[in-house]
């Protein structure tokens, strides 16, 4: 009986503090992170490519995309001045480039989803949804964005040397720093 109770306790703790690490052996010693990436390789997070922002049905604030029409990285947020949600452009210019010919013949499953954490009601749409209210994602960390040899359109990293968010539109990097 003691073994069953102990096993049950560990299962509940594992479900409650679910964390995912990609590219590293274990997650950081913090309960405030739901998803983090290894920081030893010059690799980034590739955002989903969409034909245009209007093709994203049911977007919620926090949704991030690479818009093939505008060739820009965008995220969906609440704009107080407009009292509504808007797509915010994270790319400096629209000179991006992306070759989507390989994807054009593929069949898409618009309801495909992976979620980390406790699922919300109503269901939140997205390819990868971080469900927890009190946890965050740690972007892939790189010493310098320029160490990524062949970045893909829609790639995001955090440059630890310059302490900035870097997004790639297919041609140029854009930088966000506080």
Language model regions located:
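C-terminal trimerization/auto-chaperone modules of long, extracellular attachment fibers and adhesins
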Residues: 19-178
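Bacterial Sec-dependent N-terminal signal peptides
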Residues: 1-23
């Amino acid at each position: 009986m003691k073994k069953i109770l102990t096993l049950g306790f560990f299962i509940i703790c594992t479900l409650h503090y679910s964390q995912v690490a990609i590219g590293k052996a274990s997650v950081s010693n913090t309960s405030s992170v739901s998803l983090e990436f290894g920081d030893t390789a010059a690799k980034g997070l590739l955002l989903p490519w969409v034909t245009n922002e209007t093709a994203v049905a049911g977007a919620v604030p926090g949704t991030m995309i690479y818009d093939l029409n505008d060739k820009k990285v965008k995220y969906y947020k609440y704009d107080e001045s407009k009292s509504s949600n808007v797509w915010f452009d994270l790319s400096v210019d629209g000179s991006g480039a992306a070759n989507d010919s390989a994807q054009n013949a593929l069949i898409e499953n618009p309801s495909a989803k992976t979620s980390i954490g406790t699922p919300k009601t109503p269901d939140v749409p997205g390819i990868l949804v971080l469900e927890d209210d009190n946890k965050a994602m740690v972007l892939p960390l790189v010493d310098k964005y320029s160490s990524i040899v062949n970045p893909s359109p829609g790639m995001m990293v955090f440059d630890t040397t310059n302490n900035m968010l870097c997004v790639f539109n297919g041609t140029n990097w854009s930088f966000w720093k506080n």
